[in-house]
């Protein structure tokens, strides 16, 4: 579908005939497409775990009840089958991941389950990965939804992009409860929900394979006691380029205090950005209701979030990596709290990166506004728009 809005155009990813990527649990997924058939393999297996093959059936993919019949579009519904005696839900999710990476331009995909995969229907429907459309002629004709997949529907805990979740899914399946809390600082005076505790420093909080650069991107809760983390953070903040935007240059004592304050502050968490384990930059995610930005902007919800980012290493700069890092930070925010409706940021208005934010990301530049230390641009990414148009590849 067309994703052009306010200067942003999503670049489509076209997978090669044989395509390989890695899941967060290090499982290797390989898919091969030939003559319209997609076969999906795991690890070094010589036999496919899943096969999506052409089928005579077509299903309407235009929204039912919205689009007039004379405008409605239908698409062929491939048959989803397997050579396995029983395909696990974990592997079914991996197979759908591989399929979506070959159909990045689609919002929904029709599928027909056969006798080998019909047992997966409860998993697909009850998790929201798929639904049975009105024009289905059998209960095993489904539409799978891309936005649902990227929101983590049906994702196995060990393969989920969000790592070290709080609350831990093994101890609680409910979201963190809504308990009124209060923050009073120099710039903030507000009630807000009590925030969940942060994962331990050094814990990976997000991991995703970035297909455009063929590397694994991770976000790790920064650990100031980790010599590699601290040395990199200090070097980046003391560089001329980063200091223009962040203005945190100083001795080690200043950096240690900054990171200690971040660790003690429940509303904000610092993360190390890495590519295949190589440290690349630093970012922060925060609950914006009790952030100074929330005070000066106003109108933000109890669960809305904000991000900050710096790319410290020159070799990890560039459009595709920058877009992937920003997209991943937004993705992590929306995944960690399903009640988050918007994620915002406030870069300095005079930074050269600002015009590129509209071109690279599905966000709006709302306005310029004043903060005590800078004139900033207020950017907004909305949940629905993100999962419709973000470049999650």
From Swiss-Prot:
Classification via Pfam families: Acetyltransf_8
Stored InterPro entries: Acyl_CoA_acyltransferase, Acyltransferase_MbtK/IucB-like
Domain of life assignment: Eukaryota
Pathway the protein acts in: Siderophore biosynthesis; ferrichrome biosynthesis
GO BP, sorted A to Z: ferrichrome biosynthetic process
A GO term, aspect molecular function: N-acyltransferase activity
Entry keyword Cell division: no
SMART domains to which the protein is assigned, alphabetical: AlcB (SM01006)
EC number of the protein: 2.3.1.-
PANTHER family tied to this protein: LYSINE N-ACYLTRANSFERASE C17G9.06C-RELATED
Function text: L-ornithine N(5)-monooxygenase; part of the siderophore biosynthetic pathway. Omphalotus olearius produces ferrichrome A, but no other siderophore has been detected. Ferrichrome A consists of a hexapeptide ring made up of one glycine, two serine, and three N(5)-hydroxyornithine amino acid residues, the latter acylated by trans-(alpha-methyl)-glutaconic acid residues. The biosynthesis of ferrichrome A depends on the hydroxylation of ornithine to N(5)-hydroxyornithine, catalyzed by the monooxygenase omo1.
Family stated for the protein in its record: Belongs to the lysine N-acyltransferase mbtK family.
Protein name (record): Acyltransferase ato1
Upper taxonomic lineage: Eukaryota, Fungi, Dikarya, Basidiomycota, Agaricomycotina
